[in-house]
């Protein structure tokens, strides 16, 4: 079994070296469906006489490793792209159990890759930064201090509310907050939904068409990609909102 756990860009660069070792009866294991789903763009086309399988943990590699060492695990999706040996399912589930998956749900390489890229650009990372920044900016533009704007936008969300609705659901959250917050949340969730859904639809179509994959391939293949990435991350890190975060984190009770 050959495990391909490299970044999407790296898979493309090492594929010519890897492919000769994929002899009949072996298995090629992925943790993400990108390379196979957009094989017309990545050039990753496995031989037909091997198993091609995937277990995709629903979280970061850092979280997966930390939880594994603690005897816990992330939930994972799994998929079989090719079953040349008749053992692909057994191999896949064994790996899923071996990495400590809380539970395993079946998918396809295409569905995993499409939902993953949508999530990363949407609610998991891209959209959440956009939403937080928009609210922070409006509060600051209306005279609120950096500390107040950050606490009401980010700190309360991440330190207090997220753990609660992660454990109990959003209905529980709404049932266990102040009546003022409850009424406002119920009234405003629909305008936010209606404003955001067209953006998510546009994003999904960009992912499904392969456009997002191509953007990723093109940008990651540039020789100065890392340099430009560091510049973008530096700008984010040095923005007022995230500089305020540094101060606020230092003031948490556990840090004093």
Which sequence ranges carry the predicted segments?
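Rossmann-fold NAD(P) dinucleotide-binding segment
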Residues: 1-44
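Catalytic cores of large soluble enzymes that bind and process phosphate-bearing ligands
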Residues: 6, 10, 84, 127, ...
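Short, basic, helix/turn surface patches
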Residues: 12-21, 134, 174-179
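A broad, structural surface signal
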Residues: 16, 20, 133, 137, ...
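Rossmann-fold dinucleotide-binding core
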Residues: 29-121
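Active-site-proximal catalytic alpha-helix in oxidoreductases
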Residues: 86-141, 147-165
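NAD(P)-dependent Rossmann-like dehydrogenase/reductase catalytic/cofactor-binding core
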Residues: 141-256
């Amino acid at each position: 079994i050959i495990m391909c756990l490299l970044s999407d860009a790296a898979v493309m660069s090492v594929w010519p070296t890897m492919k000769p070792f994929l002899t009949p009866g072996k298995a090629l294991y992925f943790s993400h469906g990108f390379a196979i789903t957009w094989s017309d763009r990545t050039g990753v086309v496995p031989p037909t006489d091997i198993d091609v399988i995937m277990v995709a943990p629903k979280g970061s590699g850092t979280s997966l490793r930390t939880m594994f060492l603690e005897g816990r695990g992330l939930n994972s999706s799994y998929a079989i792209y090719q079953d040349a040996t008749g053992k692909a399912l057994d191999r896949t589930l064994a790996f899923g159990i071996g990495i400590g998956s809380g539970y395993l749900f079946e998918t396809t390489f295409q569905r995993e890759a499409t939902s993953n890229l949508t999530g990363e650009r949407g609610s998991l990372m891209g959209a959440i930064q956009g939403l937080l920044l928009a609210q922070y900016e409006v509060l600051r533009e209306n005279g609120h201090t950096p500390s107040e704007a950050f606490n009401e936008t980010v700190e309360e969300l991440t330190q207090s509310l997220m753990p609660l609705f992660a454990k109990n659901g959003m209905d529980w959250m709404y049932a266990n907050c102040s009546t003022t917050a409850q009424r406002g949340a119920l009234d405003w969730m629909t305008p936010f939904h209606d404003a955001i859904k067209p953006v998510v639809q546009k994003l999904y179509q960009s992912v499904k068409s392969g456009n997002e994959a191509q953007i990723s391939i093109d940008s990651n293949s540039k020789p100065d990609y890392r340099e430009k990435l560091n510049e973008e991350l530096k700008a984010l890190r040095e923005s007022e909102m995230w500089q305020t975060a540094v101060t606020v984190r230092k003031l948490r009770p556990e840090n004093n």
